[in-house]
Amino acid sequence: MTNETSPCHIFIIAWVCTLAGDYFLSVTQTHLTLGIGLFCVVQTMYMLYLFLCSDTDKKPTLSEPAVRIALFVFLLVVLLVMNMLTLQNALAVLDISLLGYNMFKTWGQGKEMRLFAIGLSLFFCCDICVGLRSILPQEMCMIMFILIWSFYLPSQILIVIYGIRVAFRDRGTFRLS
């Protein structure tokens, strides 16, 4: 990887977008669409990292983007049929599609990405709970709230630890530039 596409830069962009997304979704609870869009950027950064880490012999073929696009379009159609297609919901579907792809991709990358795979899997469980919270009865909201944070906090800790380990491995020392 070149300096322009170093894992350190990719992870820093993802972490900044995560903090900004958390700010809009959790702290202020305003601009929810922007917050979800920022998490789409996070997943895009992780997808870029996975692409750059792929062996040159095993770079994704055209079938991989086709599968992701097909899943995304299918979920959009489901939203349309349910009369729930909004920009916010479309971004949420994009986010969960990207996250699901990244999660499955990391599990296939071997032991060196295990920590990242576990972090993304917990992140996926968190997002599933967020989705369930929006459709479950009000009485279940507190349980979903607890589950969301029970999955989310460990996911972010594992992802940050993994990113720091990558920065040390690739640079010899931890530097942000």
Residue ranges and their predicted role:
Residues M1-S177:
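Polytopic alpha-helical membrane-helix bundles and their juxtamembrane interface segments
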